[in-house]
């Protein structure tokens, strides 16, 4: 099969077909099993992070270097010409003249698509506001497949901040292609947005609301925890919702043996440290898979054959 992602922007999961996602998934698994250090030889990647990041930025940069490429960029938009008023369109024009691809994180929804419109090289969205995070979704798919042996017809529970959490939005849009069933556990003020539940209905995917993490752990194959993102609230609002849904090891007592607890990280208090030793905990392995998922994205975008 010809590489369907060569020279393509990776902006939103909704832009990708099931076949493209499977191609990415299988490439990530192949690179994990048999690493290659030559796929980005002679390539220069622009790492443009206008918003703080640890795992995403470092795993992308690790992926580039493991593939034989080099990285230039910044980790704080305050230290760029954006602070002087330069538009995102102009920034994309300039950096695309220096590099072979751009990896961008930005606090504004839709920023990745703006950059892609004006860039001369592929743009990979590393998170744009509350909107999309496609590379996180790919590493989630790799992890789910790795732990469950399939993606079809799984029961996926999502808990915490489902309104602003771009990771759960992207993951729903991906897993609906495999006919998964969903359960949501969140305060009403942080419920899954209507546009996501409408997409699930259109795909004939069932979903429900559950009242507790114990229920979710007993029902699900995957329990996907999320952090309430303090940076998206004022202090008064944050105090009202903080700690509403925190997972402890005792809540996993009736979980199925195959249940795995995932989290995009960083966590605060929504997963108690006593969960780390549970056989269901898999979020640190999930983070490691970020390197292989991002190796797959970069390799396929910049090579006709991998």
From Swiss-Prot:
Q: Which residues are carbamoyl phosphate-binding? A: 55-56, 105, 133, 136, 265-266
Query: Mind listing the GO molecular function terms for this protein?
Result: amino acid binding; aspartate carbamoyltransferase activity
Binding residue positions for L-aspartate: 84, 166, 227
What GO CC terms are in its UniProt record?
A: cytosol
Membrane spanning stretches: none
UniProt keyword Magnesium, yes or no? no
From the Swiss-Prot or TrEMBL record, give the protein name.
Answer: Aspartate carbamoyltransferase catalytic subunit
Q: Which gene encodes it?
A: pyrB
